[in-house]
From Swiss-Prot:
SUPFAM superfamilies: Zn2/Cys6 DNA-binding domain (SSF57701). Keywords: Activator, DNA-binding, Metal-binding, Nucleus, Transcription, Transcription regulation, Zinc. SMART domains: GAL4 (SM00066). GABA-dependent positive regulation of genes required for catabolism of GABA (UGA4, UGA1, and UGA2). Its main location: nucleus. A motif (Nuclear localization signal) lies at residues 55-62. UGA3 proteins associate in oligomers, at least in the presence of inducer. Disulfide bonds: none annotated. It comes from Saccharomyces cerevisiae (strain ATCC 204508 / S288c). InterPro entries: Fun_TF (IPR021858), Zn2-C6_fun-type_DNA-bd_sf (IPR036864), Zn2Cys6_DnaBD (IPR001138). Residues 17-44 bind DNA. This is Transcriptional activator protein UGA3. It is found in: Nucleus.
Length: 528
C-alpha cells in the first residue's frame, strides 16, 4: 500500500574510496584515509579519473583479496611459508599474466609496523606501481616476486618501497610543475627512515654476508624512487653507495657476484627465495647495470665486466647456480627493466664510456681510436633480438617487444652518430633515422612498454630541427600522453632538457657535442 511516503534511497558518493565502494558503504571522503578505513585498518585508496580500466580492475581485485584475508584465521606458519614458496616458483601462462600478482599476505608484524597511510602506500606499490614499472609478464615481475618478499624481512626495504609509492603519488598527471605536498612529505619521511635503517644495520655481523643483498636492494629501490620524483643529484649518490656495497662484498669485478660463495641462507630465506644465491643476485645486478648505463656518465664498473656477467658460460658457474641452463632462467626471461634489450644496453654503455674517454683527448689522439669507433658502429647495425624469451608469448606481445627492440636500436645508433661520429642532426641520415623512430614510438606509446621510452624520446627530441615546429608540438603531445599514465618525473626532466637545448639553438648557441651540452646545462638526469 502506498501511503504517499517515498522510500529514501541512500546515495553513494562517486568520489569515495575504492574500499568503501567494494564494501558498498558510504565513504566519509576524508583524505588521505576515510573514517571507516582508519577505524577498521583497511587499505584506503582514492582513484583519480586518469587511472585506466585495467589498473582499476587490478586495484579492486587486490583490495578484495585483502578484505577477504582479514576475515580468515591465519593459517599455520608452515602452511603459509609453503604457499609463499609455491607462489614464488610459479611459472604462469599467458592467462596468468593478466591476473593480479598476489604477494605474501600482510602479516600482523607488517600491519603493526605501519599506520593506515603506510598500508595504503604498500598496497599502491603492490597493486599498481610495481606493475607499471616492470615491462615483463606478471610472473617475471621481480619488483613483486623479489622486492616485496624482501620487504617482509627487512624494514629498510619496506620503507624504501613506501617512499617510492609516495613519490609517485605526489606527481600530478595534469600539471607538470605541481606536486602534492602531503605525499612529498611522506616520501621524505620514509626515505629518511629507510636510510636510517641502512646506517643502523650496515655494520651488523649477522648480516655481513647475505645481508648486503638486502642493503643493495634497498639502495636500488631508493634510487628508483628518486629518479621517479625527478631528482638530478641524490640518485647518483645512492648509485655510488650501491657500487661501494658491491666492491666491499664481491670485489672490484662485479661479474663475480654469481660465483662468489656466501653464507648459507636461512630456512626463511630458502622458503621465500629458492634460488637466493642466484636469482636475487642476478636481478639486483641487472637493476644496478640498467641505472648505471642510462645516465650518460662513465659506468661504475667496466663494460667488459657487465658483458661477462651476462655471458651464458655455464662452466663459470657453480653447480648451485644451475638455473642458468634452464630456458626459464632469469637470463632467458624478459627482464622487468630491459625486456630483450640487454645487448643494446651494453653497446650504449660502450658508446657513453668511449665518448667520455675521448673528451679528455686532443683531436690528434682521438684519431687513434677510429677503429674502435667503426667497430662499435658495425656492432650496432648487426644487433638482432633473441627470440628465445618470446617463444611463449602471443603474437601481439611479441610484436611490441620487437618494436621496443628496434626503438632502442635506432636510438642507440642516433646517439652514437651524434656523440662519436659528430654527425650534424640536420644531416639526411639522422633525419631518416628520426622519422623511422617517430613512427615506431607511436606504435608503443600507450602500451605496457611505454615506461621504457624516456631515452628514445630524448634522442628523438634532440634531433628535431630548429624550425620544425610541427615535430616539436608532436613531441610535446607524446610526453603529455605518456605522463597521463606513467607519471615518472624523469620523463619531465627529459622534456625540460630538450626544451633547454631547443632554446639554446633558437638563441644561436651552436653545440654539436651532445654529452658536453648536457654537462654545460648541469642536468644530471637518469633516463632509466
Amino acid at each position: 500500500m502506498n501511503y504517499g511516503v517515498e522510500k529514501l534511497k541512500l546515495k553513494y558518493s562517486k568520489h569515495g574510496c575504492i574500499t568503501c565502494k567494494i564494501r558498498k558503504k558510504r565513504c566519509s571522503e576524508d583524505k588521505p584515509v576515510c573514517r571507516d578505513c582508519r577505524r577498521l585498518s583497511f587499505p584506503c585508496i582514492y582513484i583519480s579519473e586518469s587511472v585506466d580500466k585495467q589498473s582499476l580492475k587490478k586495484i579492486k581485485a587486490d583490495i578484495q583479496h585483502q578484505l577477504i584475508s582479514k576475515k580468515r584465521k591465519h593459517a599455520p606458519d608452515s602452511a603459509q611459508k609453503a604457499a609463499v614458496a609455491t607462489r614464488t616458483r610459479r611459472v604462469g601462462s599467458d592467462e596468468q599474466d593478466n591476473q593480479v600478482y598476489l604477494s605474501k599476505p600482510l602479516e600482523d608484524c607488517i600491519s603493526q609496523k605501519l599506520d593506515s597511510m603506510g598500508l595504503q602506500l604498500y598496497n599502491y606499490y603492490r597493486s599498481h606501481l610495481a606493475n607499471i614499472i616492470s615491462i615483463a609478464p606478471m610472473n617475471q615481475n621481480y619488483y613483486l616476486n623479489i622486492f616485496l618478499p624482501m620487504a617482509h624481512e627487512n624494514d629498510g626495504i619496506l620503507f624504501a618501497i613506501l617512499a617510492w609509492s609516495a613519490n609517485h603519488l605526489s606527481i600530478s598527471s595534469s600539471n607538470e610543475l605541481r606536486k602534492d605536498e602531503i605525499f612529498v612529505n611522506l616520501a621524505n619521511k620514509y626515505t629518511y627512515m629507510s636510510l636510517s635503517h641502512l646506517k643502523t644495520n650496515e655494520g651488523s655481523s649477522a648480516c655481513a654476508k647475505l645481508g648486503f643483498l638486502y642493503s643493495l636492494a634497498q639502495i636500488l629501490i631508493l634510487c628508483g624512487s628518486e629518479i621517479c620524483q625527478g631528482d638530478v643529484k641524490f640518485w647518483k649518490i645512492l648509485l655510488n653507495i650501491g657500487k661501494n656495497l658491491i666492491e666491499n662484498h664481491v670485489g672490484k669485478d662485479v661479474s663475480r657476484i654469481l660465483t662468489t660463495t656466501t653464507e648459507e641462507p636461512s630456512l626463511e630465506e630458502r622458503i621465500i627465495f629458492p634460488n637466493f644465491n642466484s636469482v636475487v643476485k642476478y636481478w639486483l645486478i641487472v637493476n644496478f647495470i640498467y641505472h648505471d648505463i642510462l645516465n650518460f656518465n662513465t659506468t661504475s664498473f667496466p663494460i667488459e665486466q657487465y658483458e661477462k656477467f651476462f655471458q651464458r658460460d655455464q662452466n663459470s658457474l657453480p653447480s648451485s647456480a644451475n638455473f642458468i641452463e634452464s630456458i626459464d632462467s632469469p637470463i632467458e626471461e624478459i627482464d622487468p627493466l630491459i625486456g630483450i634489450n640487454k645487448p643494446i644496453l651494453l653497446l650504449l654503455g660502450q658508446v657513453t664510456n668511449l665518448t667520455r674517454f675521448l673528451q679528455t683527448m686532443e683531436q690528434e689522439e682521438m684519431l687513434e681510436h677510429g677503429d674502435k669507433i667503426l667497430s662499435l658502429q658495425v656492432e650496432i647495425y648487426k644487433l638482432q633480438p633473441s627470440l628465445m624469451a618470446l617463444e611463449h608469448l602471443d603474437d601481439e606481445k611479441k610484436f611490441y617487444y620487437l618494436e621496443l627492440f628496434e626503438i632502442m636500436k635506432i636510438s642507440t645508433l642516433m646517439f652514437f652518430q651524434l656523440t662519436l661520429l659528430k654527425i650534424d642532426k640536420d644531416s639526411l641520415e639522422l633525419q631518416i633515422l628520426r622519422n623511422k623512430l617517430d613512427s615506431k614510438l607511436d606504435k608503443v606509446i600507450g602500451t605496457f612498454l611505454e615506461g621504457s621510452l624516456c631515452f628514445p624520446l630524448f634522442i628523438y627530441g634532440v634531433c628535431i630541427q630548429v624550425e620544425d615546429m610541427e615535430k616539436k608540438i608532436d613531441l610535446e603531445a607524446k610526453f603529455d600522453d605518456i605522463l597521463k599514465r606513467y607519471k615518472c618525473y624523469n620523463f619531465q626532466n627529459a622534456r625540460l632538457l630538450i626544451r633547454k637545448i631547443w632554446q639554446n639553438e633558437a638563441d644561436g648557441i651552436s653545440e654539436h657535442d651532445l654529452v658536453h651540452m648536457i654537462d654545460e646545462l648541469d642536468y644530471n638526469i637518469n633516463f632509466a
